[in-house]
Structure formats: C-alpha cells, structure tokens
Amino acid sequence: MEYSTLIARLKTASESFENLEVQLADPDIANDPKKLESIARERSKLEPLVIDFNKLLDTDKEIEDSKNLLKENRNDKEMESLINEELINLEECKNQLIQKTTIALLPKDPRDERSVMLEIRAGAGGSEACIWAGDLARMYERYGQKIGWSVKPVSASESDMGGFKELVISVKGDSVYSQLKFEAGVHRVQRVPATESQGRVHTSTATVAVMPEADPVEVKIDPTDLEVGTARSGGAGGQNVNKVETAIDLLHKPTGIRVFCTQERSQLQNRERAMEILRAKLYEIQLKEANAKERSQRLSQVGTGDRSEKIRTYNFKDNRTTDHRLGSNFSLEPILAGQLDEVIDACIAQEQKRMMEDFNNDVN
C-alpha cells in the first residue's frame, strides 16, 4: 500500500474515532444503555489504531526535524553521526508502526470475537483413533483453561476401548474463534498404540471442526423441521441416572444433522445445549456456502475450516509436531500439554501476511 493511501485511511479512522467520542458525550445516547455500550465498544476498538496513527505522525515530524538538523550540522562530524544514528532508529520505528497500522486496517472477520463449539471426531484407525480424539480434547481443554476460557463437554459418544467416537466441546470466552479457527482440519498421529504387541507404529486420524456460536436470529430453525426424542442418560445425575429420560436426541430433518446431548442434568438443559450445537452446525454450513467462491480462489489452507484438510501430524517416536500449513516443526510434549500459542501465533502471522498481500493488490 502506498504510504499516502495508508495515511488517508488512518485519517478516516481517526475522524470516526472523534465522531464516536462526540456521540458518547451526547445526553440522548447516554440515556440509551444499549446504544451507549455499542458506541463505547466501537470506540474501544479504534483507540489503539488512533494512538498508533498519532505516533506515526509524531515520528514523521521527528524524522523531518532530524533531517533539517542534519543539514545544519554538515561540518560537525560528531553531531552528524549522532543524528544519522537517530534517523536509523526513527525509520525503524516508522516501519514498525506502518506494519502495525496496516495489519489493524485489514478486514476483520466478524466471527473472531465469538465463542465456539469444537467438534472432534475419530477418523481412520479404529479404537486408536478414538483414543486420539480424547487426547486432542484434553489438549484443547488445557489450552483453554490456560487462557481463562470456559471449556465444557456438551455432547459425547464414548468408545468401549477408551476415548471418544465423537465429542462436542463448548468453549466460551473472549475472541475464542480468532484462535481456534486454525485448528479445523485433520489431525494425524503416528505412534505405537498401547494394544500393539509388536511395537509397530500406527497412523490414526481425528477431524476437528470449529463452529462459531450462532444467535437464534442468525439461524432460524423451523420447529416442524425437528424430530425430538428422549432417552435415559448415562451421565452425571445421581439417582436420576437410567431412571429419568434426561438425554435429548435431536434430528434436523432437512439436513439430516443429528445431535445427542446427555451432559446436562435436566431434559430442558440438554435440549438447550442440543439446539445450541445444531445452530452452530447450521451456521457453519451457511458460512461454507457463502465462502465457497472465495475459498476456491485462494490456494492458502489457513483458516479454511475444511475437514478434509490435513493440517498437522503428531509423531510420538520423534517427539515432533509438524504443521503442514506452516511447514514448521514443534516439540510434541508442550503441544499436547496445551501450549499451542507458538503454532497458533504463527498461523495468525501467516494469515495476516496473506491478507496484506491481497489488501495491497486490491488497493493497487
């Protein structure tokens, strides 16, 4: 992006920020809590960008002053050296601010701030794939707890040999989707199963779908499209276990999506959870259809959410995790312990780089 174009866009953002501050001082808006909260939120989002814009303007002024000072001290070698050193530092600071503000101006994914439903399904590999699905669930649970998110299983189909055939986890918190969306795809494991007597390495897979939570307004479900059944729950519930039908079996007839929810203690709670999962699944379908054209035009695999996409291999023998999108290796043990920051940050950086290239092409 041309520097003049960047400055023009930053000025527009600064003007919007000033306009929001004027609105916040308006008594009529102050008496409307919902509108006040919305404007305050928008102002809060713009404030860091405006601060960096002002820093950029100040840095430009300092560079100009230093260059003028350099002209005045051409005969003073010591002063000239000091000014040149200062100019190098100022130019470096300017470049950092240009990159930071350009990234901040990139189009935002409106779903990034949402909580998610994380669906993990055992893939190829039989019982070992189910065990692997359970390992992935624990990895995400540890990661979420470390950040301070609320992580709770809402639907599970356990395997007789351990682990899960399918597991849906609710992850609630700030900007959950912005981090976990990079986990969507096929996760492959290479290791010797506990049941393997010959010590041979087996390859198994599990798929992860990351579905941003949807509001009822965004996904309207016709009650006549639902087939609702009940069953006795095998989960927590004390004396209610196997006596009261608290589990909910929900079928969405137009799509064939089935949700079986047993984790809550009451039938009403399980129904609410099942509807929450169904909305997220239907919302994911809507998003995939809406973005199909864009995805076909982009070769990048980052953030596509395509379940057929192999994104990562976990090799136990070599204690190595390979992220195929990044072409980078990471130590296995920290990753499984929930220390995903390094790999997710790298995915974010890769996506930002791709978006900056697209952004510059659009501008030019």
Swiss-Prot record:
Q: Name one GO molecular function term.
A: translation release factor activity, codon specific
Top-level taxonomy: Bacteria, Bacillati, Cyanobacteriota, Cyanophyceae, Synechococcales
Q: Which domain of life is it from?
A: Bacteria
UniProt name for this protein: Peptide chain release factor 1
* Stored Pfam families: PCRF, RF-1
State the organism named in the record.
Prochlorococcus marinus (strain MIT 9312)
Sites of N5-methylglutamine modification: Q239
State whether keyword DNA damage applies: no
Q: What family does this chain come from, according to its entry?
A: Belongs to the prokaryotic/mitochondrial release factor family.
Q: Where in the cell is it found?
A: Cytoplasm
What post-translational modification information does the record give?
A: Methylated by PrmC. Methylation increases the termination efficiency of RF1.
Q: Which gene encodes it?
A: prfA
Give the protein's function: Peptide chain release factor 1 directs the termination of translation in response to the peptide chain termination codons UAG and UAA.
GO cellular component term, pick one? cytoplasm
